[in-house]
């Protein structure tokens, strides 16, 4: 289409969280979704051909009895990861399709705690919506500074660089 640039990505669903990795080169192998150690998982996703950005999606949702930013894994005051290892994802979803069912500002508070802790993590809008009959669609957008005079020919590498730089 002449109206947008397509980018291949993958939502990596694990027992310890949901992540998006992008861009991924066509016909790349699938990431190992059975990894539960985040350091190993981040390394495996970043090893995929073309990947420049990894996002943590819906971090307050329960994933098989694991909540990525739950009190046993995350200090919401200090922004510390209680697992001991630093966070290495590039962005945090701060508006989710389920946000209207809970404290809509909780993820913003979490994100600011991470920033205050010293992490350079971008905030993103909704990563996905699974159920159009229960959740509000299109409630958030993520904007990235990038030349866009030719929407079908966006420089994806530059857009990803600006994304990671929180621009």
Predicted feature residues:
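Extended, charged catalytic domains and RNA/DNA-binding interfaces, predominantly
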Residues: 1-167
């Amino acid at each position: 289409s002449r109206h947008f640039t397509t980018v291949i990505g993958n939502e990596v669903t694990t027992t310890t969280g949901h992540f998006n990795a992008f861009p991924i080169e066509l016909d790349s192998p699938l990431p190992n979704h059975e990894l539960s150690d985040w350091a190993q998982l981040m390394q495996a996703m970043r090893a995929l051909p073309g990947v420049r950005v990894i996002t943590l999606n819906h971090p307050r949702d329960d994933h098989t009895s694991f909540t990525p930013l739950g009190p046993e894994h995350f200090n919401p005051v200090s922004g510390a990861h209680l697992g001991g290892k630093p966070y290495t994802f590039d962005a945090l979803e701060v508006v989710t399709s389920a946000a209207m069912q809970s404290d809509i500002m909780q993820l913003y508070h979490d994100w600011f705690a991470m920033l205050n802790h010293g992490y350079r993590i971008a905030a993103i809008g909704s990563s996905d919506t699974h159920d159009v009959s229960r959740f509000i669609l299109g409630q958030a957008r993520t904007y990235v500074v990038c030349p866009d005079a030719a929407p079908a020919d966006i420089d994806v590498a530059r857009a990803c660089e600006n994304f990671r730089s929180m621009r």
